[in-house]
Amino acid sequence: YFLLGLFITAFYSCGEDLTPVGPDIAEITHFRNDGPYLFYENGRLKILEVTKDNALNIREESGLPAGLKLDVYSDDNQLLFQVPINKIENFERPAWEDRTEYAKTFAVSDLHGRFDLFAAILKTGEVINDKYEWIYGSNHLVIDGDIFDRGADVLPILWLIYKLEFEAKAVGGRVTTILGDHEE
C-alpha cells in the first residue's frame, strides 16, 4: 500500500503548474562572458563566444590557422590567459596499461568550476607559474573529476587543462583527467 500511495501522490502532483519561473529568454539583454567554443566540421572552424562587451562573436576560418591563439576570460570578464589551438592528429586515448612512472604526481579533484582555487592550488604546488604555464617538468598532474557544478568558471578550467596537456607533453610530463560523477 505504501508504494501505491507514493504512486497516487506522484500522479496527482503532475497536475501542478510547471510554468518556468524567472526571466523569459527573449527579455534577457545582458549576457555574461562565455566561450570560446570551437566547432570543426568539413574543414571549417567556427569560433563562438560572448565577449565582455556583451556581444555574440562568431568567427569562421577555413581550416585551422597556424598560430591560432584564443583569449580565455573568467566569468567576471578578467583575461586569464591565451590558449594556442593545436591540431590533433590521430587522437588515441592513452592505454590504462601505461605504467609510466613519474618522479612526482600532483593530484587534485572536486574543482566545481572554481578556476581561482584550481589555479591557486596548481601555483602553490609549483605545477604552473603566474602566467598559467606548465613548470612541473616531466611530472604528472592528475585531475580526479568533478570539474563541473557550482562555480561559474568551468570553461576556463577546461581550457587550462587543454593548454597544460600540450605544455606537459612537450617536456615529458603528463596531464591525466578522470571523469567524476558530475561529468557522467
Task: Label each residue range with its predicted role.
Residues 1-21:
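Bacterial Sec-dependent N-terminal signal peptides
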Residues 14-184:
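Feature recognizes metal-dependent phosphohydrolase scaffolds
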